[in-house]
């Protein structure tokens, strides 16, 4: 499909097919697929045979099938995975990809997704500037996920294992006779076939693994099974940190670091694991994802760069009190928590006010007859005299605006009320009455005593 004129070409045989990069959401990687060409591609190909003299183009399809062909192919940048592109631009020193003169600007959503991934991998910072790790990743001719895994493997003397894992992830799974998703089974099978030089369906995977070893100057293959499944999980987590998953209540159910749920078949050996790292999965929006390739992992093997610390202050409605915990997390997954002994007063008050908007009916005595009577009195006066512009003291409004009136009543001579027994003692009627200006209180007492 080149636009150059090639001397001597008189005949073109067009298969009607071409190889294109397709993004696979299961592995979050791109791979080549053979697919049908569009009509503009067919015209371009036919033109090769008639540039300098009459020529012939043999099209290996029927004229009747042309109505099924799209008229024009869409630019690859519209649907491509942009992680490598964004990283390359950052390596050139440009943090804003839209400062380049694109013929077709990349979709903003795809750019943001790529930036988020590269930030998670540690290849760029939050400002879009490339990091030292990102510089190394950018020099490797593979997807940033794979490059990150192979580079990190060097620090753990696991480079050959990382090359085998990368090859297994990129190709179609040869183990069609098992529903077990443990990728370690594939690594063992690959090494066994490679040692016996009976590759068969493993040939392409072995070739890719060899290419990766050559890329990192580690030419000798490893055909032993002297690797730990947890090593496999650790390497996968370097490439897919958002796909670390923790077991939840039901057997075979896990929650990903991004908050989504996935499920393994109950017969899968990985159901016994507390933590797994997933290399290949498929998940539809709102549905439980299906895992294809994964490995066990232990928290001690987590990359410290993806662990975040935070103080979590929240209202526990079951216990009826504030719970203050210092937490270590990977995404939305809790690794470890410990109680916080000293909490800022403002943070306590803010937490109670936020909880009031959601649980306020059970936290305070809103159903007290005196509270209901006061609300009815004020509502009647507001109905009779709208010109008074009386404040809204309906329960719904007061709950949603608790931060405006409640803080004063939560501080009892320096002691902040933080449990339901203390909050039930707050005089809600008096608190509501004090919201109303004094001159309007007099009018209410006179019109609705």
Which functions belong to the PLM regions below?
Residues 1, 38, 130-134, 143, ...:
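Residue-level signal for threonine
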Residues 264, 446-449:
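Amphipathic, interaction-prone secondary-structure segments
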Residues 8-11, 17-69, 85-87:
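Conserved segment of the helicase C-terminal RecA-like domain
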Residues 15-19, 27-28, 32, 38-40, ...:
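Extended active-site and interfacial segments that coordinate phosphate-rich ligands
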Residues 158-253, 258, 274-447:
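Acidic, serine/threonine- and proline-rich low-complexity intrinsically disordered segments
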Residues 59-194, 204-225, 230-248, 252-266:
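C-terminal accessory/connector segments of nucleic-acid motor ATPases
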Residues 1-5, 13:
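Conserved two-lobed SF2 helicase motor
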């Amino acid at each position: 499909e080149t636009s150059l004129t090639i001397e001597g070409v008189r005949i073109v045989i067009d298969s009607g097919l071409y190889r294109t990069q397709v993004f696979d959401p299961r592995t979050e990687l791109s791979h080549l697929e053979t697919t049908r060409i569009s009509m503009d591609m067919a015209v371009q190909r036919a033109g090769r045979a008639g540039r300098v003299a009459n020529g012939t183009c043999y099209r290996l399809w029927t004229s009747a099938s042309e109505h099924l062909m799209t008229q024009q192919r869409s630019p690859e940048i519209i649907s491509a995975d942009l992680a490598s592109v964004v990283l390359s631009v950052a390596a050139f020193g440009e943090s804003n990809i839209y400062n380049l003169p694109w013929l077709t600007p990349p979709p903003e959503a795809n750019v943001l997704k790529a930036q988020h991934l590269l930030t998670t991998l540690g290849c760029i910072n939050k400002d879009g500037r490339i990091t030292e790790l990102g510089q190394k990743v950018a020099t490797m001719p593979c997807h940033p996920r794979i490059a990150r895994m192979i580079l990190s493997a060097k620090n753990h003397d696991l480079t050959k294992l990382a090359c085998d894992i990368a090859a297994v992830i990129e190709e179609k799974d040869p183990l069609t006779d098992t529903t077990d998703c443990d990728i370690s089974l594939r690594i063992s099978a690959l090494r066994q076939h490679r040692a016996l030089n009976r590759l068969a369906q493993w040939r392409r995977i072995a070739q890719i693994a060899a290419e990766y070893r050559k890329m990192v100057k580690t030419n000798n293959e490893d055909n032993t099974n002297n690797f730990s499944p947890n090593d496999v999980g650790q390497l996968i987590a370097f490439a897919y940190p958002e796909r670390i998953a923790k077991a939840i209540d039901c057997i075979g159910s896990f929650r990903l670091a991004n908050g989504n749920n996935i499920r393994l078949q109950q017969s899968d050996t990985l159901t016994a694991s507390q933590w797994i790292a997933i290399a290949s999965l498929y998940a539809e929006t709102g549905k439980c994802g299906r895992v294809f390739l994964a490995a066990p992992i232990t928290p001690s093997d987590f990359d410290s760069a993806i662990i975040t610390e935070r103080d979590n202050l929240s209202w526990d409605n079951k216990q009826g009190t504030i719970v203050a915990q210092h937490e270590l997390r990977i995404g939305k997954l809790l690794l470890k928590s410990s109680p916080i002994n000293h909490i800022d007063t403002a943070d306590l008050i803010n937490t109670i006010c936020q909880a009031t908007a959601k649980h306020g009916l059970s936290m305070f005595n809103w159903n007290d007859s005196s509270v209901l009577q006061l609300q009815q009195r004020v509502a009647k006066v507001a109905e009779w005299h709208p010109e008074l512009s009386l404040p809204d003291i309906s329960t719904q409004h007061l709950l949603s605006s608790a931060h405006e009136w409640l803080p004063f009543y939560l501080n009892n001579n320096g002691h902040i009320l933080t449990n339901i027994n203390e909050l039930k003692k707050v005089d809600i009627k008096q608190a509501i009455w004090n919201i109303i200006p004094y001159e309007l209180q007099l009018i209410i007492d006179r019109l609705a005593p």
